[in-house]
């Protein structure tokens, strides 16, 4: 089994976990929890990633929680935090989990050095001591313990609020840390919205993030039936809050590409992700494009924005027979295809 670099450095330090009830959280991407479970009293996972949750949900040996906040009761006395790409998300997870588990909780933090994992030294200072105990494969391994009472966690305090102006409409956006375009209006999304035709029927917003695209589409096309999906529980929570803030209706839910969606969409609209953690990752978008025809109605349309360097047109052409470029600027292109 090939593990990620953070898991490999953790594997070197299994003695830290002996006799512990370990709760794993953060940017975990491999099957290392199964290995860890052999060396500790119990292992559970809290993940905001729906795809990762689905991988572990079927295994009885490891309990897996999915959501934007851990609300279930757990007997964990140690956190293993895989440092996420966004520092703000790390702080969110750390604060939320320590508030849940309480004083005396031990913590191990692992991550690639380029991800900014060193920030844990300052971030954890108010909770207790933490020190680096290992470095390998350009990763660091920290161990610490919460010796102070953690403050009460209220998720509402973590939403960043900002406004998006589009065609004389003002959209109130509420976004949690770790969500794409957190706190700002992404230029690719703006070009996509400027290019969209009038929408009708059942519309899917794939990779909804904080809900900007879906909210604008619903504001301009109030009669559409809107589904908004994302793999991230933080995005789902953000989109729900954004719709609520604008008195809009839509169905927001987690889906690993089309795993939980309906079929027969008139439009699939997306600013799809192409990063997973610190690495460029295209597989979910490729699946989005390849399977789009079978999820569209007759003459249904796929419209997406992408960075100009991404080679999506050949995939779209293979799936649909043709790929049109509706608009472009020096960074983004808008692609479209019709069933």
UniProtKB/Swiss-Prot annotation:
Its EC number is 2.1.1.172. It holds the Pfam family MTS_N. CDD domains: AdoMet_MTases. Keywords: Cytoplasm, Methyltransferase, rRNA processing, S-adenosyl-L-methionine, Transferase. It catalyses: guanosine(1207) in 16S rRNA + S-adenosyl-L-methionine = N(2)-methylguanosine(1207) in 16S rRNA + S-adenosyl-L-homocysteine + H(+). InterPro entries: DNA_methylase_N6_adenine_CS (IPR002052), Mtase_sm_N (IPR013675), rRNA_ssu_MeTfrase_C (IPR023543), RsmC/RlmG (IPR046977), SAM-dependent_MTases_sf (IPR029063), Small_mtfrase_dom (IPR007848). It is found in: Cytoplasm. Its main location: cytoplasm. GO terms for molecular function: 16S rRNA (guanine(1207)-N(2))-methyltransferase activity; nucleic acid binding. GO terms for cellular component: cytoplasm. Specifically methylates the guanine in position 1207 of 16S rRNA in the 30S particle. Belongs to the methyltransferase superfamily. RsmC family. Monomer. This is Ribosomal RNA small subunit methyltransferase C. It comes from Aliivibrio fischeri (strain MJ11).
